[in-house]
Amino acid sequence: MVRYRMRSLSERSHEVHGQQVHGQDQGHNGQEEQGLNPEHVEVYERTHGHSHYRRRHCSRRRLHRIHRRRHRSCRRRRRRSCRHRRRHRRGCRTRRRRCRRH
């Protein structure tokens, strides 16, 4: 493995020859060559775009979960307040309206 890494450093000037003979091995051993090879650049763009898409998808899920949690937490607070203070039922209604606005 060490000998091959030394060879890959000397083969930087011969990128085309290196891709035809050992394209996969260079991708695993030499990280610097990934930026030089156009194939690795395309793979990097795909992976980067995919990670960015995952971030957007997760953010949508998180916003949806946060909205659900707020709604559930408001219901729990309303139930607790109603059980604890039966006279102040109007306060629960105002809390409902506030939660719907958010």
Swiss-Prot record:
The modification Phosphoserine is found at residues 8, 10. Testis. Residues 18-29 have a biased composition (Low complexity). It is found in: Nucleus; Chromosome. Pfam families: Protamine_P2. InterPro entries: PRM2. Residues 49-102 have a biased composition (Basic residues). GO terms for molecular function: DNA binding. Residues 1-102 are annotated as: Disordered. Residues 8-17, 39-48 have a biased composition (Basic and acidic residues). The keyword 4Fe-4S does not apply. Protamines substitute for histones in the chromatin of sperm during the haploid phase of spermatogenesis. They compact sperm DNA into a highly condensed, stable and inactive complex. This is Protamine-2. The lineage of its organism: Eukaryota, Metazoa, Chordata, Craniata, Vertebrata.
